[in-house]
């Protein structure tokens, strides 16, 4: 597979996941701000912007200014707004039409073309419908990719990108709650933002506890958005890309080593000590995500720099642009 196609598919996976996760987080935050008068809108908005890696403005924030920054801003710092993420996913799909299905392309293209109308409706009726639209389109894209794409290297690159983005987003969510009390309602907000509230309640029979929430989000083997599950998925797809499933010496590349090390540390950690070392462990996982991106760029993408949240917008969105220059 051409390096530009591999990289485009990898970033399609990341950008669609980024748009989906950002919509989920913003939707929960907006509901909280509108329904709970005890929450300070400016403080809560700044915390959310910090989670998403967006530089907060100097003026005071409310629901509407927060929505404009997170959902509708273009050329955002880090390319982390929902509109920018969808635009970038669509541009990458456009550059790799020969390795994507018509259905997945039409899904992204239709979503992109509907953004202006959906934005106007959101400013009249509120942001919930827009955010639900993004979540639904991301789910549709995932379903179409699952049902129409060959299980080849391109599909594996897309899943690899999605898995790494999920690790990064879950880590950011947990970092925002470091230092909160065990009984803080913010833990419920975290679970809702990750789409795991109902699953958590079924798993732990409705008992809300900070330690269990951290265990669930970090270690659960069955919840698809947990850090462990996402690392395992990334590690599996990278191993499939290596085309050497029976290697007698284990990890042969830097990306494999980094993912395997992060996964094994979580696999054998004592759950009871997670809260005690949470901040340092999360910081280490963020570093791992960045280093894995660098290693993949060197190994597969002709050493193209990894697009971090802080410089994604400066990348120009279209992966293939470097090939053309």
Regions found by a protein language model. Name each.
Residues 1-325:
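Alpha-helical transmembrane segments and their helix-helix packing motifs
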């Amino acid at each position: 597979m051409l390096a530009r196609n591999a990289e485009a598919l990898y970033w399609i996976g990341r950008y669609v996941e980024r748009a989906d996760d950002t919509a989920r987080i913003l939707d929960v935050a907006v509901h909280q701000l509108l329904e709970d008068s005890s929450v300070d809108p400016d403080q809560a908005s700044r915390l959310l912007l910090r989670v998403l890696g967006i530089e907060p403005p100097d003026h005071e924030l409310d629901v509407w200014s927060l929505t404009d920054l997170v959902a509708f801003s273009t050329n955002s710092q880090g390319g982390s707004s929902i509109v920018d993420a969808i635009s970038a996913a669509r541009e990458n799909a456009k550059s790799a039409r020969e390795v994507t299905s018509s259905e997945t392309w039409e899904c992204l293209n239709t979503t992109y073309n509907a953004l202006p109308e959906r934005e106007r409706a959101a400013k009249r009726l509120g942001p919930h419908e827009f955010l639900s639209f993004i979540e639904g389109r991301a789910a549709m894209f995932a379903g179409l990719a699952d049902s129409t794409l060959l299980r080849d290297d391109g599909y594996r690159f897309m899943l690899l990108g999605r898995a790494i983005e999920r690790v990064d987003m879950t880590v950011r969510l947990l970092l925002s709650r470091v230092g909160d009390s065990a009984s803080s309602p913010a833990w419920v907000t975290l679970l809702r933002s990750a789409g795991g509230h109902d699953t958590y309640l079924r798993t732990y029979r409705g008992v809300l506890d900070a330690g269990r929430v951290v265990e669930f989000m970090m270690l659960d083997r069955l919840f698809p958005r947990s850090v462990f599950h996402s690392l395992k998925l990334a590690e599996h797809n990278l191993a499939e890309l290596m085309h050497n499933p029976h290697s007698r010496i284990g990890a042969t590349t830097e990306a494999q080593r980094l993912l395997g090390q992060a996964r094994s540390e979580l696999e054998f950690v004592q759950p009871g000590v997670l809260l005690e070392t949470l901040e340092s462990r999360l910081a280490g996982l963020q570093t791992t995500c960045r280093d894995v991106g660098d290693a993949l760029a060197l190994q597969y993408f002709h050493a193209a720099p990894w697009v971090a949240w802080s410089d994604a917008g400066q990348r120009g969105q279209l992966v293939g642009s470097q090939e053309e220059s």
